Design a protein with these regions (language model features):
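Catalytic and substrate-binding clefts that recognize carbohydrates or anionic sugar/phosphate headgroups
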Residues: 81-82, 125-279
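Mature N-terminal segment immediately following signal peptide/propeptide cleavage
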Residues: 77-89
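Long, intrinsically disordered low-complexity tandem-repeat segments
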Residues: 2-29
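A low-complexity, Ser/Thr/Gly/Pro-enriched, surface-exposed linker/loop concept
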Residues: 37-71, 75, 90-133, 169-174
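Exposed beta-strand and adjacent loop surfaces of beta-rich binding modules
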Residues: 86, 96, 150
């Protein structure tokens, strides 16, 4: 009886498999991130709201000592200590200086919702005399009086733009802050609304300049002298330009004073620089 031939099994080459039968492995696509939801300012006050006059006087307190005890410069900022707390100046650009203050010498200065430090390299310096510390960029200087701790902002040629009050220039108390400025009596002060053309008049007035109930936006004060103040606060911000009570800029829900001095020379340039402080 003839033996049955064993079936020969040939290995199947990749080429012999029809295209339709090939298993195709598709790369797994990354899960797309949901769009970020803008943080809302929780303040109950809308931009331009009038405050209750009973809230305008600064509450009674023991006067703090802001005399400069020591200063320490790093590559990014300078810390200036007093018995009241730590004042930090952070040059952001040649035209912008961030000013931060916390109560107590052991308290850490925190980042805010906005840009914390410079992202581009540029030259800045600190000069010390018997009476003052001078932090300078190519465009602007901040001069700190050693006796009072108050800051005076100047142009490169020494023209004074803005002064903090010499007696107790700033104050933090029970989650509320006050930053006292000495605006000239003839100086026109405005707060920028949502639109660049929406300017709130603040001469001899007190108004809320934060955007309660709206997506997070930094309040911006504009002066006809060519500078602006960006207030890095996430809740209520009140500007009181009434001499009986201030003048001051106050925040609620904050335990750190934080603002940007912006010297754009014109409102348009100042607003452009302000927009670049958003992360």
């Amino acid at each position: 009886v003839p033996k049955k031939e064993k079936p020969v099994i040939h290995p199947v080459s990749e080429k012999s498999v029809p295209e339709k039968e090939k298993s195709v492995i598709h790369p797994v696509s990354k899960v797309s991130k949901a769009p970020e939801i803008a943080q809302i300012n929780p303040s109950p006050y809308a931009f331009g709201d009038l405050p209750d006059n009973r809230l305008l006087p600064v509450r009674g307190h023991s006067r703090m000592n802001y005399t400069v005890k020591w200063a320490k410069k790093t590559k990014k900022h300078i810390d200036i200590a007093s018995m009241a707390g730590i004042l930090r100046l952070t040059p952001m650009t040649p035209e912008v200086i961030r000013v931060s203050f916390v109560k107590g010498v052991t308290t850490e200065i925190k980042d805010t919702y906005w840009k914390p430090e410079a992202t581009d390299v540029f030259s800045w310096s600190v000069r010390e005399s018997k009476t003052a510390l001078k932090v300078s960029t190519e465009k602007v200087s901040a001069v700190i009086d050693k006796k009072t701790g108050a800051i005076q902002f100047e142009t490169a040629d020494g023209t004074v733009l803005l002064k903090e009050r010499s007696v107790e220039p700033r104050l933090i108390m029970d989650q509320q802050t006050w930053e006292f400025f000495e605006w000239d009596s003839s100086e026109k002060i405005n707060a920028k609304g949502i639109l660049s053309t929406d300017l709130l008049v603040l001469r001899a007035k007190a108004k809320y300049i934060s955007f309660g109930g709206k997506p997070m936006r930094m309040p911006l004060v504009l002066s006809r002298k060519g500078y602006g103040l960006g207030i890095a606060a996430k809740e209520t911000v009140l500007l009181c330009n009434i001499k009986t009570y201030g003048p001051y800029i106050s925040t609620l829900g904050e335990d750190q004073i934080d603002y940007y001095f912006i010297y754009g020379e014109t409102n348009e340039e100042t607003i452009s620089m302000y927009k670049k402080l958003t992360l």
